[in-house]
UniProtKB/Swiss-Prot annotation:
Lineage: Eukaryota, Viridiplantae, Streptophyta, Embryophyta, Tracheophyta
PANTHER family: FOLATE RECEPTOR-LIKE (PTHR31755), OS08G0320800 PROTEIN (PTHR31755:SF2)
Species: Arabidopsis thaliana
One GO cellular component term noted in the UniProt record for this chain: chloroplast thylakoid membrane
Name used for this protein in its record: Uncharacterized protein At4g37920
Domain of life of the organism encoding this protein: Eukaryota
Keywords assigned: Coiled coil
Coiled-coil positions: 135-168
InterPro entries given in the database record: At4g37920-like
C-alpha cells in the first residue's frame, strides 16, 4: 500500500500520468492512510497507471544497476517497485520534470514519509554518480544529492520547531524567546507549505491559527527586546549628559540632541523620572536637585522647539468630542502611511508604543504639576474632560494595540517622571 510520497512521485502532475514503457500495464488504486505530524489526514486516494517493465538510464538497465547495490535497495516499497527503482524515479523527477528547489520542498515537507527513503535516496545518487560515464550527468547527480541534503536539513529543523510548538501549545511565548532565531521566514513558508498538503479545511485552519499565534509571540518578543534596546540607548545618552563638565554643557547637549532629532521619548522619560525622584527625595542634596531642575527645564524648552508629531496628533485627538470619531481617528493614526506632515492632521502617523509614551509623559506632567497652582498652564490643564480623554486614549491603546510585555517594559522608567505641564507640549 503506497503512501502519499510514493503516489506523489508516480503521479507527479495533475495532467500527466507518469509511467514506464508499457508492457503488461496494470492499474492500481492507492488509498491514502498516511498521516503527518500527529494524525492529520492527507489527500484522498488517486488512481495511477504504470507498468513493471525494466527501466533504462543511459544504456544501463535497472536490472544491471540493481546487481551492484545492497539488499535494502531490492526491497519492494510499492507494488512492482524496489527501493532502487523508486529512488531512480525521484532522481528523474528532481532532475528533469521538477528541477526547482521550491518544487522539491513540496515532497520533502512530508517529513515522516520522506525520512523512510532519504538515506537510500542519497545512497542511490552516489551509486548512480559513481557508475555514470557522462561527466555532465555525473555532476548533476552529485549536485542533486548535496542540494537535497541541504534542504532536508533545513526542513527537519523547521519540523522539529513545529513539533515542539504542537507539543507545548501553551508555551509558545517561551519557545519564541528561546528559539527566536529559528522563527524565520523560511519556517513560516514551511508551515504554509505543510498546510497545503492537508485535505480538510479544519486542519488547514488549525495550522493557520497556529502560525498566527507564532507570529504574535515573535512580535511580542521583538517589541519587548526593542523596548529594552531603546531604554539602553536612552540610558547611555542620559549618562553622557550627566558626565558633562558643567550644567550649561549638559543643557547644551540636550539642545543638540533635540536639533538632531535624537531627543526621543525614552530619554525624556529618563530625564523626567530623575528630576521627579530628586524633587521628592529627602536625601538628595539641593545641588543635585538644582542640576536636575536645569536639565528638566532644558528638555522642556527643547521640546517646544521641535514639537514631535505625536504631540500634534494628541492635540488633534483631544479636540475630538465624539468618542467614536476619536477612536476612528486613533485607528487611522496607526494605519500604514507616509511619515510626513500634512495640512490634514489625520495624515500624521505613528506607532501605538510611541504615542503611548507621549500620553504617559503628559499625564505624569499633570500629576506632578496639579499641586503647583501658581503655574498658569497647570491650572488650565486641570479640566477633568481633557484628562479623562487622555486616560481613555491610554487605556484604549493598551487594550487594543499593545502587548502586556511591552507595557511592562515601557513602565520601567515611568514612576513619577516629570514636571512639565500638558499645555507646554500642546502649545
Amino acid at each position: 500500500m503506497a503512501n502519499l510520497l510514493e503516489t506523489s512521485i508516480f503521479f507527479s502532475s495533475a495532467d500527466k500520468l507518469l509511467s514506464f514503457p508499457p508492457k503488461n500495464s496494470q492499474t492500481h488504486h492507492l488509498p491514502f492512510s498516511a498521516f503527518i505530524n500527529g494524525g492529520r489526514k492527507i489527500r484522498k486516494s488517486s488512481t495511477i497507471t504504470f507498468a513493471t517493465d525494466t527501466v533504462t538510464y543511459n544504456g544501463t538497465t535497472s536490472a544491471e544497476v540493481k546487481s551492484s547495490v545492497e539488499d535494502p535497495m531490492e526491497v519492494e516499497v510499492a507494488e512492482g517497485y524496489t527501493m532502487a527503482q523508486f529512488c531512480d524515479k525521484i532522481i528523474d523527477l528532481f532532475l528533469n520534470e521538477k528541477p526547482k528547489v521550491k518544487q522539491w520542498k513540496t515532497y520533502l515537507v512530508l517529513r515522516d514519509e520522506w525520512n523512510k527513503y532519504s538515506v537510500n535516496f542519497y545512497k542511490r545518487c552516489r551509486i548512480r554518480a559513481d557508475t555514470e560515464t557522462d561527466p555532465i550527468l555525473k555532476q548533476k547527480l552529485v549536485s542533486l544529492e548535496s542540494k537535497v541534503k541541504k534542504i532536508d536539513k533545513e526542513m527537519e529543523k523547521h519540523n522539529d520547531l513545529l513539533k515542539e510548538i504542537q507539543e507545548n501549545p501553551t508555551d509558545i511565548n517561551a519557545i519564541a524567546a528561546k528559539r527566536r532565531r529559528d522563527f524565520t521566514g523560511e519556517f513560516f513558508r514551511y508551515v504554509t507549505l505543510l498546510s497545503e498538503t492537508l485535505d480538510g479545511l479544519e486542519d488547514r485552519d488549525a495550522v493557520a491559527r497556529l502560525a498566527t499565534r507564532c507570529l504574535s509571540a515573535v512580535s511580542a518578543y521583538d517589541n519587548t527586546l526593542e523596548s529594552v534596546e531603546t531604554l539602553d540607548t536612552a540610558q547611555a545618552k542620559f549618562e553622557d549628559i550627566l558626565n558633562s563638565p558643567s550644567v550649561d554643557s549638559a543643557c547644551e547637549k540636550i539642545r543638540s540632541l533635540a536639533k538632531a532629532k535624537e531627543l526621543d521619548s525614552s530619554l525624556i522619560l529618563l530625564i523626567n523620572s530623575a528630576y521627579a525622584a530628586a524633587k521628592e527625595s529627602q536625601t538628595v542634596t539641593n545641588e543635585a536637585k538644582d542640576i536636575m531642575y536645569h536639565l528638566y527645564k532644558a528638555t522642556k524648552s527643547s521640546l517646544r522647539s521641535i514639537t514631535p508629531k505625536e504631540i500634534k496628533l494628541l492635540k488633534y485627538l483631544l479636540n475630538i468630542t465624539d468618542p467614536e470619531e476619536r477612536f476612528s481617528a486613533l485607528a487611522t493614526a496607526f494605519s500604514p502611511g507616509d511619515d510626513h506632515e500634512a495640512k490634514d492632521p489625520k495624515a500624521l502617523y505613528t506607532t501605538p508604543k510611541e504615542l503611548h509614551k507621549w500620553i504617559k509623559i503628559m499625564l505624569d506632567a499633570y500629576h506632578l504639576n496639579k499641586e503647583e497652582t501658581d503655574i498658569k498652564e497647570a491650572k488650565q490643564m486641570s479640566q477633568p474632560i481633557v484628562i479623562q480623554r487622555l486616560f481613555i486614549l491610554k487605556d484604549t491603546i493598551e487594550d487594543e494595540y499593545l502587548d502586556k510585555k511591552t507595557i511592562v517594559a515601557d513602565e520601567t522608567p515611568k514612576k513619577e517622571e516629570e514636571d512639565t505641564t500638558i499645555e507646554d507640549f500642546l502649545n
